[in-house]
């Protein structure tokens, strides 16, 4: 269900929107969901649709960039734009344009290595950059630290449920992971389309294949399979719009 200023949108309203086919497909999926998506204006809804389309594209681009998976202790990045902290965070350098720094991760992927939650935040930043443009992004994001689920001025939240949409982050949990490789206790992944995910360190895979790979990374004699959690992590678009100058 989609509500705009208290008005519940119908399928014919979605058909009238001046959007791409990908965005229209996302809107129709939102319309069919039992949970409500509420916006103060049509422009907020259009922002969300653009952001989700850019999230899907950016997730694919990051997987294909050559950026590596690494634990925090082995994180590295292009030192022209980023300083690696002792904790393994990538901190935007003073006076470095945030737009160029984020784009560089996608353009010079082999110069970077980071873990999967950091990858999700990077994808969200890139999607936002594509949505609002370089100047607005640089004005609003003069300080960025890429570290796990740390983020600046990006209202990310997690809810229980199964109302998954393209551009959402989902989590595959591996309860009996190998203790010698704790980085494989689970995998964050962006939903690209029905049962197709972008998972940093694994690739673009079906849900079944992600589970199969995680099961291969369990401790000896493990009995419990990895599984997809009934939760979704996404950006609160109306709140984000209020934050951007």
Curated annotation (Swiss-Prot):
Pfam family, one: TGL
Gene Ontology process terms (BP): sporulation resulting in formation of a cellular spore
Keywords tagged on the record: Acyltransferase, Sporulation, Transferase
Domain of life: Bacteria
EC main group: transferase
Catalysed conversion reaction: L-glutaminyl-[protein] + L-lysyl-[protein] = [protein]-L-lysyl-N(6)-5-L-glutamyl-[protein] + NH4(+)
The EC number(s) this enzyme carries: 2.3.2.13
Role according to the record: Probably plays a role in the assembly of the spore coat proteins by catalyzing epsilon-(gamma-glutamyl)lysine cross-links.
Entry's family note: Belongs to the bacillus TGase family.
NCBIfam families reported for this sequence: PRK03187.1
Record protein name field: Protein-glutamine gamma-glutamyltransferase
Organism of origin: Bacillus licheniformis (strain ATCC 14580 / DSM 13 / JCM 2505 / CCUG 7422 / NBRC 12200 / NCIMB 9375 / NCTC 10341 / NRRL NRS-1264 / Gibson 46)
């Amino acid at each position: 269900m989609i509500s705009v200023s208290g008005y519940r949108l119908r399928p014919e309203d979605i058909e009238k929107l001046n959007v791409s086919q990908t965005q229209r497909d996302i809107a129709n999926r939102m319309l069919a969901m039992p949970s409500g998506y509420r916006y103060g204006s049509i422009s907020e809804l259009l922002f969300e649709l653009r952001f989700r389309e850019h999230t899907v594209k950016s997730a694919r681009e990051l997987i294909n960039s050559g950026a590596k998976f690494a634990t925090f202790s082995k994180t590295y990045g292009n030192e022209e734009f980023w300083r690696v902290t002792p904790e393994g965070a990538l901190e935007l350098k003073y006076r470095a344009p945030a737009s160029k720094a984020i784009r560089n991760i996608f353009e010079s992927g082999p110069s970077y290595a980071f873990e999967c939650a950091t990858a999700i935040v990077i994808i969200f930043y890139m999607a936002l950059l594509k949505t609002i443009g370089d100047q607005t992004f640089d004005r609003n994001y003069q300080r960025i630290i890429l570290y796990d689920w740390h983020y600046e001025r990006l209202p990310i939240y997690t809810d229980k449920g199964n109302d998954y949409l393209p551009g959402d982050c989902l989590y595959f949990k591996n309860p009996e992971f190998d203790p010698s490789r704790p980085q494989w206790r689970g995998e964050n992944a962006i939903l690209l389309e029905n049962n197709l995910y972008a998972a940093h360190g694994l690739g673009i895979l079906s849900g079944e294949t992600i589970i199969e790979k995680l099961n291969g990374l369990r401790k000896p004699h493990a009995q419990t399979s990895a599984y997809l959690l009934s939760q979704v992590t996404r950006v609160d678009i109306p709140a984000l719009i209020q934050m951007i100058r």
